[in-house]
């Protein structure tokens, strides 16, 4: 049975070897002459107007986390819908519990004001 996965293992091994070889060759043979211009951020050919490292508002992180959570919900929901006939009532109720937990979490975030942009 493991013989079926051997070509995948060979492919991953060769890919890893090529990636490590390319990185190693670049590190050994590449020039190491950093100067101020090479270490500065690049902004369309102009000198940087201000520091490129600005703090982000926490609300962006909250929206990103909510997006990831509901994106994962979709990733679980589509395969579940495909195999729903085969998994029976246990699979149905397991997904309903999962969706209920997500809905409760969404309502909690909504009530806490995480979605308001004041």
UniProtKB/Swiss-Prot annotation:
<keyword id="KW-0997">Cell inner membrane</keyword>
<keyword id="KW-0472">Membrane</keyword>
<dbReference type="InterPro" id="IPR023043">
    <property type="entry name" value="NAD(P)H_OxRDtase_bac/plastid"/>
</dbReference>
<dbReference type="GO" id="GO:0030964">
    <property type="term" value="C:NADH dehydrogenase complex"/>
</dbReference>
<feature type="transmembrane region" description="Helical">
    <location>
        <begin position="8"/>
        <end position="28"/>
    </location>
</feature>
<comment type="similarity">
    <text>Belongs to the complex I subunit 3 family.</text>
</comment>
<dbReference type="GO" id="GO:0008137">
    <property type="term" value="F:NADH dehydrogenase (ubiquinone) activity"/>
</dbReference>
<protein>
    <recommendedName>
        <fullName>NADH-quinone oxidoreductase subunit A</fullName>
        <ecNumber>7.1.1.-</ecNumber>
    </recommendedName>
</protein>
<comment type="subunit">
    <text>NDH-1 is composed of 14 different subunits. Subunits NuoA, H, J, K, L, M, N constitute the membrane sector of the complex.</text>
</comment>
<keyword id="KW-1133">Transmembrane helix</keyword>
<dbReference type="GO" id="GO:0048038">
    <property type="term" value="F:quinone binding"/>
</dbReference>
<keyword id="KW-0830">Ubiquinone</keyword>
<keyword id="KW-1278">Translocase</keyword>
<dbReference type="GO" id="GO:0005886">
    <property type="term" value="C:plasma membrane"/>
</dbReference>
<keyword id="KW-0874">Quinone</keyword>
<keyword id="KW-0520">NAD</keyword>
<keyword id="KW-1003">Cell membrane</keyword>
<dbReference type="GO" id="GO:0050136">
    <property type="term" value="F:NADH:ubiquinone reductase (non-electrogenic) activity"/>
</dbReference>
<keyword id="KW-0812">Transmembrane</keyword>
<dbReference type="InterPro" id="IPR038430">
    <property type="entry name" value="NDAH_ubi_oxred_su3_sf"/>
</dbReference>
<feature type="transmembrane region" description="Helical">
    <location>
        <begin position="87"/>
        <end position="107"/>
    </location>
</feature>
<keyword id="KW-0813">Transport</keyword>
<dbReference type="Pfam" id="PF00507">
    <property type="entry name" value="Oxidored_q4"/>
</dbReference>
<comment type="function">
    <text>NDH-1 shuttles electrons from NADH, via FMN and iron-sulfur (Fe-S) centers, to quinones in the respiratory chain. The immediate electron acceptor for the enzyme in this species is believed to be ubiquinone. Couples the redox reaction to proton translocation (for every two electrons transferred, four hydrogen ions are translocated across the cytoplasmic membrane), and thus conserves the redox energy in a proton gradient.</text>
</comment>
<dbReference type="InterPro" id="IPR000440">
    <property type="entry name" value="NADH_UbQ/plastoQ_OxRdtase_su3"/>
</dbReference>
<feature type="transmembrane region" description="Helical">
    <location>
        <begin position="63"/>
        <end position="83"/>
    </location>
</feature>
């Amino acid at each position: 049975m493991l013989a079926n996965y051997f070509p995948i293992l060979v492919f991953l091994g060769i890919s890893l070897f090529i990636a490590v070889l390319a990185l190693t060759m670049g590190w050994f043979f590449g020039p190491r002459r950093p100067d101020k211009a090479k270490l500065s951020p690049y902004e369309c050919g102009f000198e940087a107007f201000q520091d490129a490292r600005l703090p982000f508002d926490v609300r962006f992180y909250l929206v990103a986390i909510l997006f990831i959570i509901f994106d994962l919900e979709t990733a679980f929901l589509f395969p579940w819908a495909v195999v729903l006939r085969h998994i029976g009532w246990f699979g149905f109720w397991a997904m309903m519990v999962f969706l209920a937990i997500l809905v409760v979490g969404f309502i909690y975030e909504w009530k806490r004001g995480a979605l308001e942009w004041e």
